Structures are given as structure tokens and as C-alpha cells.
Amino acid sequence: MNYLVSFADSRMYKSLIRLSKQAHTFKFFDKIFLLNEYNLSNSFKKKFKNNLILGSKGYGYWCWKPEIIMNIMNEINNGDCLLYVDAGCHLNIHGKKRLLEYFDLIKKQNKGIIAFQAVEPNKKNSKLKYDGRKLRNLKNYKWIKGDTLDYFKVRDNDTVTNAQEIAGGVFLIKKCEQSIKIIKEWQKIIYTKFDLISDTPSVSANLSGFIENRHDQSIWTL
């Protein structure tokens, strides 16, 4: 089974309506989950009541993202696949062929996650063709605060700090043991180390060239 998942607080309901219309044109998804704050559990809303504020950045720095994904994964079967997209994304029907390629890829791989970086496809393990478009420079040292680098013990790992961030707004997941483990770890960090996704200043020094924290995406990347 193939699913689409997105979330927006009630101020952005028009984005979810638009996304729903676009998704239905694909005639591909077995079920479409378009969620808002009313779909969050009472316990989650109580835990993050000081952050889940309408109009705030990412409705609480996107802390709800692994929460809703884990909730959906608890509903679906092993081997089922989902596409998560931020509500601001558009589903382009002219890209349906590529989307089907992604779903075909994830069904065949063991780790259960396909995520995206601003780099050309690796010809050694991908048949996807690069169309030549200019790619953004989103190196980790610019967008991940020092405290987060220290938490993951990668401050001195140039391979990591000079890599491109992994997009937190679009990814595919196949329900399997490995993907569940990753989402639960993402979820746990938000529950226990909320400062890593917030805009609070880093206690430890940021790396030279740091611009600003990329919130949930920084955790997802590392």
C-alpha cells in the first residue's frame, strides 16, 4: 500500500486542500493523510504546549513531524510505503513517472528511507538521471548549531560538516525495523533535547560560517 502524509496547522488549511487535489490527480495513493493540530494526541499537546502556538515558526519548530509519522506507521503494515511532504510542497503530475521510480526504489531497499540532498545522483547506485539544474549549497556547518554537532559527536568530522543537509520537507519511508528505529530516535531527541531544534543560542560554539539552525531538519540530517 502507498500513502501520502502531510501536516499543517489550521491557518494553512487551504494548502492541505490544494495538496489533496494534486494528490488525487496521481490516482496512485491508497490513502491520503492530511493532518492538523487536532490530530495530535492530548499528551503530545500537553508536553509541547509552550511551543505549539499558531503563527510560530513551523508550529513549534516542526516538533510534530516524527510524531505524526510514527502515528501513521503504527497504523500501516510492514512493507507499506509513505511519502511525506511539507504542506507548502506541490505535487506535479508531470513528475509522476519519477515519483513511481522512487516508490519502486524504496520497496527494493532494506533501510526503508529515501531522503534527498542537493547533490547529483550517485551513478554507482542510482539509475536516476541528473537534469543539470543548479543545486543549492546547504552544507551542514552553516545550518546545524554547535550543540547538535556535539550531541551526535560529529563536530570534528569534516565529511559530515561539509556534507549537504538532508531535506526534511520531502522523503519516503517503507515501514520496516530500520525505518521505525530511525523515526523513534528522531522523536526521542525532540522529546528530550528540544533545544536542539529550537532557535535558542547554542551553548557550545557554532562552526565558522554558521548561519542559523534548521530545526527538525538538522536532527533528520544527522
Predicted regions mapped to residue ranges:
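Glycosyltransferase catalytic domains, chiefly GT-A lineage
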Residues: 1-222
